[in-house]
A protein has these predicted regions:
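Hydrophobic residues in well-ordered beta-strands that form the structural core
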Residues: 34, 122-124, 200
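Asp-based, Mg2+/Mn2+-dependent phosphohydrolase catalytic module
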Residues: 2-22, 114, 127-128, 132-234
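N-terminal helical cap/lid subdomain that shapes the substrate entry/recognition surface
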Residues: 17-26, 31-110, 118, 129
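Conserved residues at beta->alpha junctions
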Residues: 30, 122-125, 182
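Short, surface-exposed alpha-helical recognition segments that flank or form part
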Residues: 1-3, 38, 100, 104, ...
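A generic secondary-structure micro-motif detector
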Residues: 37, 66-67, 121, 153-154, ...
Length: 234
């Protein structure tokens, strides 16, 4: 069989319940690598340092402001943009300037994603340059058609409904034939409400609450294993 660019040279035997899926959408952080890597811990420290520089506050006070922005504006970035007119590109480049030596390739996951039939997209609250660094570090730099990042969302991050609507519109997706995987259960209800099939990556980064449990169609602690199982290769 002749291979088509972006598709495997054969079509795996997909589980009947998921045979209708033609677009696979993945969150990035703590979804395509283990939550134990704790990249966000490094990013969080840089966010606090950035807030301290902008506000002139001591680190402990800056941390409190950072978290208040998150609660009141949805993200630290949105708070800084509203209160100080911060350039989002400058902020994101600064806070994402972290080492990624804790990341490594999961060959099983890389191979499983390569075998998935259909389109494959990244949907992240980070920015594209950071996402590309992560993907390169875990062996997935050539695995996805595109990255829908925080700039493309017009700074309305998941779980804001506008984030999902912008993704659907940008790639002309049919929600009823798309699946979205995320490690944060709170990010799944908006996707479910729009008709997407949902997969919760239960890796310890968040425990599911009653307000999210209804929106979980599938659940796994090992994405590579789950993909192998639904394609009949496990």
């Amino acid at each position: 069989m002749v291979a088509v660019a972006g598709r495997p040279a054969y079509q795996p035997a997909m589980h009947p319940a998921l045979a209708h899926i033609v677009c696979w959408i993945f969150d990035l952080d703590n979804t395509l690598y283990p939550a134990s890597a704790d990249l966000f811990g490094l990013i969080d420290k840089r966010m606090t340092a950035y807030v301290a520089r902008i506000t002139g506050l001591a680190p402990d006070q800056a941390y409190q402001v950072q978290k208040s922005y998150f609660r009141e504006h949805g993200t630290t970035l949105n708070g800084l943009m509203a209160e100080y007119g911060v350039d989002p590109h400058d902020f994101l480049a600064d806070v994402h300037a972290i080492e990624m030596d804790v990341l490594e390739e999961d060959k099983r996951l890389v191979d499983a994603i390569a075998r998935l039939p259909g389109r494959k997209l990244i949907f992240t609250n980070g920015d594209e340059p950071y996402a590309r660094r992560v993907l390169a570090s875990v062996g997935l730099s050539e695995s996805f058609e595109a990255i829908h990042d925080i700039h493309a969302m017009a700074y309305n991050p998941k779980p804001h409904p506008l984030a999902y609507q912008s993704m659907i519109q940008a790639f002309r997706l049919d929600p009823s034939r798309s699946l979205f995987a995320d490690d944060l259960a709170r990010n799944l209800p908006p996707a479910k409400a729009l008709g997407l099939t949902t997969l919760w990556i239960d890796n310890g980064s968040e425990q599911v609450g009653e307000d999210s449990s209804h929106a979980i169609d599938y659940r796994t602690g090992d994405l590579g294993q789950w993909l192998d199982e639904i394609m009949g290769t496990e």
